[in-house]
């Protein structure tokens, strides 16, 4: 626990790229690091950091959002576009889950970014009726982000949940990973989707006195 708090307290001085958000070991821009770091950073600030760096977190998302949509707008690689948008959406909803929702301006800004990223995936022209032309990692990450967004009421359940229920069915039936040779990233993302399918999707408990939002 002490080690976790030490790492959390040093997040605000962790190296950034020229755009202002966390970079990878090769100084490259990498949204996978956002997915790794930002939810942890926000959780630390909510519980132990006094929420002093909330503005830093949203500042990084502002920078990421501007770059992401500038890059994907002109990208002809739809597969790569879908993957990065799906990871970005998952990063946002996981960060929203652990922040104090009463800091409404920041929460709402992140919700706007989240909804825009989900919409952007759906506008890529991919077939999301059965997701047959998605790679498995993107399919799973997008389904996870949408399911969690619906549960947290960041998305309209009636409009979005049905889009990804087929992915849930494939996970439950073992169609996405069926043997020991399946990539570990696919297995871990399938586990995330499964975790959302078994949650109570009708009830939410916002724990104001417990450091943030505790979604059932």
Q: Where do the model's predicted regions map?
A:
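Non-catalytic carbohydrate-binding regions of carbohydrate-active enzymes
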Residues: 106-141, 148-179, 208-216
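Solvent-exposed loop and edge beta-strand segments that line ligand/cofactor-binding
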Residues: 21-34, 72-90, 101, 106-110, ...
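Terminal, non-catalytic domain-edge segments
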Residues: 177-216
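Single conserved hydrophobic/aromatic residue that forms the stacking wall/gate
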Residues: 1-8, 12-13
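A general structural signal marking secondary-structure boundaries and capping sites
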Residues: 17-18, 68, 99, 125, ...
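Alpha-helical scaffold segments in carbohydrate-active enzymes
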Residues: 43, 47, 56-70, 94, ...
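Aromatic- and glycine-enriched pocket-lining scaffold segments that form the walls
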Residues: 16-79, 83-85
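Well-ordered alpha-helical scaffold segments within catalytic/enzyme domains
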Residues: 36-50, 87-105, 141-155, 189-204
């Amino acid at each position: 626990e002490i080690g976790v708090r030490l790492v959390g307290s040093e997040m605000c001085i962790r190296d950034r790229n020229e755009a202002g958000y966390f970079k990878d070991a090769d100084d490259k821009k990498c949204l996978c690091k956002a997915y790794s770091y930002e939810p942890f950073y926000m959780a630390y600030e909510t519980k132990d950091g006094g929420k002093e760096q909330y503005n830093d977190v949203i500042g990084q998302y502002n920078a990421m959002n501007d770059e992401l949509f500038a890059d994907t707008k002109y990208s002809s690689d739809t597969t790569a576009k879908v993957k990065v948008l799906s990871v970005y959406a998952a990063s946002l909803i996981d960060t929203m889950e652990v922040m104090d929702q009463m800091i409404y301006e920041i929460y709402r800004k992140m919700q706007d970014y989240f909804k825009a990223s989900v919409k952007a995936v759906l506008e890529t022209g991919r077939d999301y009726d059965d997701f047959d032309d998605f790679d498995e990692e993107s399919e799973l990450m997008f389904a996870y982000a949408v399911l969690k967004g619906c549960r947290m009421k960041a998305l309209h359940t009636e409009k979005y949940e049905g889009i990804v229920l087929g992915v849930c069915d494939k996970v439950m039936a073992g169609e996405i990973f069926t043997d020991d040779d399946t990539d570990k990233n696919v297995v871990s993302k399938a586990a995330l989707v499964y975790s959302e399918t078994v949650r109570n999707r009708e009830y939410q408990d916002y724990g104001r006195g417990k450091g943030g939002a505790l979604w059932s």
